[in-house]
Swiss-Prot record:
It is a multi-pass membrane protein. The chain crosses the membrane at residues 2-22, 32-52, 55-75. GO terms for cellular component: plasma membrane. This is UPF0132 membrane protein AF_0736. Its main location: membrane. It comes from Archaeoglobus fulgidus (strain ATCC 49558 / DSM 4304 / JCM 9628 / NBRC 100126 / VC-16). Belongs to the UPF0132 family. Keywords: Cell membrane, Membrane, Transmembrane, Transmembrane helix. It is found in: Cell membrane.
């Protein structure tokens, strides 16, 4: 559920859920999809950026579906970069 509306549901689950599994996915979702949203908004100002923005958007839809399926099955998975940052952020909050 943390991935349903991208970073929006990630923030909501981070605020209201205490399960370590859910909180990890909430942070990972927030970091991943807020970065992708920023890229999709900012890329079109660059030459050729509109096309690149569309590629990023297509990739994000595939990634979004992958994340929803994996998390709904209860599978623990880390996305490159963002998963490591999420783990680090959560460990800082619990120590």
């Amino acid at each position: 559920m943390c991935y349903t509306l991208g970073f929006v549901t990630g923030v909501l689950f981070l605020l209201f859920d205490r399960s370590p599994f859910v909180r990890f996915h909430a942070v990972q979702s927030t970091l991943t999809f807020s970065t992708i949203t920023a890229l999709v908004i900012l890329l079109p100002v660059l030459p050729g950026g509109a096309l690149l923005s569309r590629v990023v958007m297509a990739f994000s839809i595939i990634l979004w579906a992958f994340c929803i399926v994996k998390a709904s099955r209860g599978e623990a998975f880390k996305l490159p970069i963002f998963g490591d940052i999420a783990e680090e952020q959560l460990s800082l909050n619990y120590t």
